[in-house]
Amino acid sequence: MNTFRYHKSTLYILTISILYYILCYLSPIALCDDIVYKFVWPIDNESYVKPILSLKDIFVSQYIHYQVLNGRSIVHFILQLFDGILGKELCNIISSIIFGYLIYMVSCYITKKRNSLFSYSLITVMLFLLMPGFHNEFLLFVGVFNYLWVCTITILFIAFINKYGEKP
């Protein structure tokens, strides 16, 4: 019975990941940030003319971005790597895996390793329905990096601290 429940939970996470992939695939490139990050960030913050063609372009762009706009250089480096070189399709695949992992990690954190189909379903519904601006934060290209990936890494870090941190 336990094996059957494990397989149902795994199948659920896989199904949600596939559905999330379809949503990402159907989400168009946004004309604001998604297009802007395909180019080397300009010093004047207006003339986006040089497309990202290499890692060197990304380093130059992120240096300017850091000086002109904000300090999210690590996340935006990865964003420009995908937006300029690797492409949206690979990002969609990785993001769907990360979304499934996010549901799993949140469930582990909340239920203390007693994952169940109910906890996965509840977390999924809460993410889809209660997250303000789910489309902007979890489906648009820039939002995937700024929110989904960073959120998952943060929860992974918290889980690591809980497991290996000093116990009082």
Each predicted region: which residue ranges?
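Short hydrophobic/aromatic helix or loop-helix immediately within or flanking a transmembrane segment
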Residues: 64-86, 93
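Start-transfer (signal-anchor) and selected internal transmembrane alpha helices
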Residues: 1-21
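Hydrophobic core of alpha-helical transmembrane segments in multi-pass integral membrane proteins
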Residues: 14-22, 100-104, 121-129
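Transmembrane-helix motifs of polytopic, lipid-linked glycan transferases
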Residues: 93-118, 156
